[in-house]
Amino acid sequence: MAKIIAFDEEARRGLEKGLNTLADAVKVTLGPKGRNVVLEKAWGAPTITNDGVTIAREIELEDPYEKIGAELVKEVAKKTDDVAGDGTTTATVLAQALVKEGLRNVAAGSNPMGIKRGIEQAVATVTEKLLESAKEVETEEQIAATAGISAADPAIGAQIAKAMYAVGGGKLNKDSVITVEESNTFGVELEVTEGMRFDKGYISGYFATDMERLEAVLEDPYILLVSGKISNIKDLLPLLEKVMQSGKPLLIIAEDVEGEALSTLVVNKIRGTFKSVAVKAPGFGDRRKAQLQDIAILTGGQVISEEVGLSLETADLPLLGQARKVVVTKDDTTIVDGAGSEEQIEGRVNQIRAEIENSDSDYDREKLNERLAKLAGGVAVLKVGAATEVELKERKHRIEDAVRNAKAAVEEGIVAGGGVALIQAAHVLDNDLDLTGDEATGVRIVRDALTAPLKQIAANAGLEPGVVADKVSRLPEGEGLNAATGEYVDLMAAGINDPVKVTRSALQNAASIAALFLTTEAVVADKPQPAGAAMPGADEMGGMGGF
């Protein structure tokens, strides 16, 4: 395909126009009085949202240079969302402010590389200041306030805080898995699963011990973990006899249990001679192996596998895991209070955390996070209902963002919200970091850009942006504008805070893209096809050429 090329000022202006188009659509959502944006869908009802990254993803521009500019800013929003789960609109507003001032200075003759170095040093200094001023999250109320701001609903914030504590057994658990599901009932309900749950139920309904609830409950059972299939009862018999002598029930988790092995277990269960339940192992392939190993570590057992030189015929009781209780339904299995050592579980948790850090796949990260939570304490489900499908989608999305926001707050702490932390951290740049020339210009660009989020919040609330920014910059640290009421208050005391991870990620990602904009000297894009252009070889009537 033929290409078109733009150079120097033309290239940068094309990129900036695309950035501005996208940023102008996104920034109207910022703050408590921000507006929503309606997104048309090819199928189904339109989506109404105030989430920056969702809006950004939907925007496709026609002009090739503008399209590239918009795509670069989408990357800012997406990266911030990936890292912190929120702050996408703040990142977009910061990127727009940095690029606008930066390009103005480049057009006036400043060296882009000098400005870039100044921006990088200024951002590093401000990030350090933000981390220093962050306060640790210590109470359920603080999490509720943070999540409530993100979800634009204090009641949802309270439910998320409750979920984080419930999954951690009364302690704050940043690794907790909180999933959001659609519900037919109106409102938001919290359902907490104690222990480890995986989505495989009993192989046969005859294993159920409670016929009314159709579930099997095993108290203080042994747990046999097998990486392959079990079909021959002769392989299993020696171990079964030892378990029967102990007087404990048995949970078998294997790739499959079939044939005479399954029928023998069922017959003994029905006769009441031996209580057991057979369950298929969760997952597939390598993921199944990993999850079996997770269960082994959680329960203090070992996976019976030929890969490690273990077989069913020679297996003994010390190789079996144990738990206080196991509940199995037709759809899932829950293991409560596994007997694994805390040290080994912590080691496994750290290993999974490292895998999450090194993974490039969103899907893999999601699955690893689920495994992490199951080992670290349990799973909470927030069930969301609404009057219409459009409202349900919007609400569910807001809650998912708020959950990630709350986790970010626990991880690195919180700072004053409402754009105040950024504008007050800008004071560390007052002496231009003792830099000179174009590098000092870069520092000043960052200092000015740090006022942009607060100005936008004020504008969306119908206030005069310049007046608000000037007043807040003079207030003591942590005090600022509550845009919902128009009053100037101690924001932390009022529960208006942001996770510092969100704030710093927004700034760092915005600065990264701004530096790319400023140092661009040429843009190469695909040449647009004329509207209704015929395919090569097609005749004027639209048929195949030559026929």
Curated annotation (Swiss-Prot):
InterPro entries registered for this protein in UniProt: Chaperonin_Cpn60_CS (IPR018370), Cpn60/GroEL (IPR001844), Cpn60/GroEL/TCP-1 (IPR002423), GroEL-like_apical_dom_sf (IPR027409), GROEL-like_equatorial_sf (IPR027413), TCP-1-like_intermed_sf (IPR027410)
Enzyme Commission code: 5.6.1.7
Catalytic reaction equation(s): ATP + H2O + a folded polypeptide = ADP + phosphate + an unfolded polypeptide
Alphabetized UniProt keyword annotations: ATP-binding, Chaperone, Cytoplasm, Isomerase, Nucleotide-binding
SUPFAM superfamilies attached to this UniProt entry: GroEL apical domain-like, GroEL equatorial domain-like, GroEL-intermediate domain like
Binding site for ATP: T29, L30, G31, P32, D86, G87, T88, T89, T90, G418, N482, A483, A484, D498
GO MF annotations in UniProt: ATP binding; ATP-dependent protein folding chaperone; isomerase activity; unfolded protein binding
Cellular component, GO annotation: cytoplasm
Keyword flag S-adenosyl-L-methionine: no
Localisation per UniProt entry: Cytoplasm
Name of the top EC class for this enzyme: isomerase
Main location per the UniProt record: cytoplasm
Domain of life: Bacteria
Biological process, per Gene Ontology: protein refolding
Family recorded in the similarity comment: Belongs to the chaperonin (HSP60) family.
Described function: Together with its co-chaperonin GroES, plays an essential role in assisting protein folding. The GroEL-GroES system forms a nano-cage that allows encapsulation of the non-native substrate proteins and provides a physical environment optimized to promote and accelerate protein folding.
Assembly: Forms a cylinder of 14 subunits composed of two heptameric rings stacked back-to-back. Interacts with the co-chaperonin GroES.
Protein name, per record: Chaperonin GroEL 2
Natural source organism: Corynebacterium efficiens (strain DSM 44549 / YS-314 / AJ 12310 / JCM 11189 / NBRC 100395)
Lineage start: Bacteria, Bacillati, Actinomycetota, Actinomycetes, Mycobacteriales
